[in-house]
Amino acid sequence: MGLLCSKNRRYNDADTEENTQTAEIERRIELETKAEKHIQKLLLLGAGESGKSTIFKQIKLLFQTGFDEAELKSYQPVIHANVYQTIKLLHDGAKELAQNDVDFSKYVISDENKEIGEKLSEIGGRLDYPCLTKELALEIENLWKDAAIQETYARGNELQVPDCTHYFMENLHRLSDANYVPTKDDVLYARVRTTGVVEIQFSPVGENKKSGEVYRLFDVGGQRNERRKWIHLFEGVSAVIFCAAISEYDQTLFEDENKNRMMETKELFEWVLKQPCFEKTSFMLFLNKFDIFEKKILKVPLNVCEWFKDYQPVSTGKQEIEHAYEFVKKKFEESYFQNTAPDRVDRVFKIYRTTALDQKVVKKTFKLVDETLRRRNLFEAGLL
């Protein structure tokens, strides 16, 4: 009898412990479910090369702990690859222009750099790139300074030359140091095509989550073949942050050199606006790469782009930059209202001028986005 009671007591104790564990699991699930309800989902969209991923990296630096040493080191081969790929693009572009351009002579690489150019082009075409040594960096620097390469770089918009080119070429000695660890700026400039979906959770007010919203930001591949992966992310989105690189009005797509990048951005923007699942979703439009735009607009007329063919310059210098920017902004505003159903026009729509590489601008912009979304939430709750 005593043995039976002892067994029953053990079973009861085990049941009690199991019930306690079950209750704890259920409590945690309930807490996590409640926490999830308070997390706002942001979708970062845009065509390839729009600067989305740079914005994403800035968020990690600004509102999280940034990149630890292991993460920084992981970018070293990426940055070295960027250098090799870029110098190959410029070398091969110069050769093509020397063969086909009317003013071909200025694209002919000097005799002392021809052999170096062929060697670097071969390296740039490999699947595995060597570590950037001082010797290779010096050869790249010599080729970069060649007059033909500089003339080719001036026509980089025709050759898919990336925005990071000048920055990395001017830092070759540091990048080739045996103990090189990328800086946060190096990481921001590093060019990696986003494939699939990456996410980050953050609060623009810092660690004190009680005083601000918590966001989960999703960055997705911008190239055409990546866009089918967006679909499952569309439900339950608080806001779409759409990045448009306004400096790329004279460039063509990486994946389709017959398609103007700005026209592709326009079509993608309009397609996103029409999606039924975004009926009540706020839209934040980032007119990005303003730093490049303000330099380019003084050299390349805005009306080279079909969408902007009715643009008329009115001045020079800073006035012209502002005039051109306001014209582009107005075009996007018109597109928004033309492609938004009448019953959706009251959803939040804001436009921000951004430079993804400028941390102060990105920080200020996201605080404005946070303020806008918090006001919307208060309004919907009847508290405003």
UniProtKB/Swiss-Prot annotation:
Binding site for Mg(2+): 53, 194
Coiled-coil region: none
GO MF terms, alphabetically ordered: G protein-coupled receptor binding; G-protein beta/gamma-subunit complex binding; GTP binding; GTPase activity; metal ion binding
Family indicated by similarity: Belongs to the G-alpha family.
Subunit (UniProt): G proteins are composed of 3 units; alpha, beta and gamma. The alpha chain contains the guanine nucleotide binding site.
Description of its domains: The helical domain (69-189) is required for self-activation.
Name of the protein in its database record: Guanine nucleotide-binding protein alpha-1 subunit
Organism: Lotus japonicus (Lotus corniculatus var. japonicus)
